[in-house]
Structures are given as structure tokens and as C-alpha cells.
Amino acid sequence: MNDVIIRQLAHLIPYQPLWEAMQTFTARRQSQTTDEIWFLEHEPVFTQGLAGKPEHVLNSGNIPLIRTDRGGQVTYHGPGQLMMYLLLDLNRLGLSTRTFVRTIENTVAESLQEWGIPAQGKETAPGVYVDDKKICSIGLRVRKGFSYHGLALNVAMDLTPFSCINPCGFKGLMMTQIQDYVNPIEMDAVKRTIIPLFLKNFGYNQPAIMVETSLEFLIDDHLRSFSEKLGERETVTNSRQN
């Protein structure tokens, strides 16, 4: 069994600095670094993966479009969507990239089935689906056996922005969310369902769970640039003086 830290960020996070924080964490981690999973919701943003093609962005409008270094094509992130960023040591977990993706899909599907939603993965396309509608997108990057990026699970959100793109590069792909099957639904309830399944399926001990109501945990050297980019430079300075 391996240790893991779960961080739950309690406010909407802009994409760019969060992405840079993941890159920095991954570049500086070592074999003894504890794995981390970050739970959060993003401010509205389209992200274009490494395989992304411009023709799949139909009309981004006023929503920012950021080209990122995860796998896959274009998708949307926004409030009401649960992001799980998986900063894991795949070598330590004994997982190939393919098995890693399948374990994510199976875990998400298992959690949705607990809500009575008949979700499952597809052999032909990463992610989790209910019938032919996509409810969870997966986009990852693995460097030297360390993963970052993760999954986006649609919980209770405005799905309209997905109509401005071909989600994940598939023209006409319909998106769905937990709220379409279980209403009302609370984000915290979804987390309470999915966390134990991730721990079980990935072989983790009971985690240290950090509820981050501020960005003070980002004072650590490997995340200081993230803190500053989010306008927390003054908070960091004050924390060091106290």
C-alpha cells in the first residue's frame, strides 16, 4: 500500500497557473515524493491537447482557449465539473500507461454505478460514457513514469459551451452529467463516493486530506510560482513574516 495526499481546493481556479504548478511538481518530484490528487473546479476555459486540431474549435467566444501538454484534443472545463489531477508515480504503483487509463475509467464508472448511472468505458475512445453520451473526459501526460493532468467529471454544470467545440475531437458527440440522472446532486457527495474507490483500486492507504481554503499550501518552493500567479504574493510574504 502506498501513501497519497488529497488536496481539495475550495474556490474556482484559473487553468494556466494550475497547469504550470502540475508541471513544476512533476519536474521536481523524486522517487520518495508522496503522490498527490488535487480536487477542484476551474474557471471557464477550453483546453486543447497535444493532438488537438483547430477545426474542432467551432466558436470559443469569450471563453479562453489554452493549448496544453496533455493528451487528446479539445474539451471544456468550468464550474460544476469535478477536476481530479492525478500526480502519481506509475512505476511505484506498477501501472503501465494503458492500465492506468483503464483503471481510471473503471473507477469512475464504478462510482457512477453507485448512483444508479449505467456508465462504462469504451475500447475505442478514452473516457466514461452513459450510452453514447460522454460524462467524464480523461487527458494525461506521463514523464519518466510520473503522471499529471487527469480527469474531468461532469457533475452539475452548464453544458452549453461543449456545443462550441467538437468535444475530444468527435463531431456531434453529446455530453451529459450526473445531474441529468440524479437531481439534486452535491459535489461533496460525488467526492465522498469516488475517493474510497480510487484508494481501493490504486492501492493507497487512507489519505491525508487537506481542504485548502486559501493558497498557503502553495508556499512550498515547487509551487511558489503558482501562488504568485494567482495574486497571492502578499499572502505568501505575510505568512513568512508571521
Curated annotation (Swiss-Prot):
Hydrolase found in the keyword field: no
Pathway: Protein modification; protein lipoylation via endogenous pathway; protein N(6)-(lipoyl)lysine from octanoyl-[acyl-carrier-protein]: step 1/2
Keywords of the record: Acyltransferase, Cytoplasm, Transferase
Gene3D superfamilies given in the database record: Bira Bifunctional Protein, Domain 2 (3.30.930.10)
Domain BPL/LPL catalytic: 31-206
Name of the protein this chain belongs to: Octanoyltransferase
One GO CC term on file: cytoplasm
Organism: Coxiella burnetii (strain RSA 331 / Henzerling II)
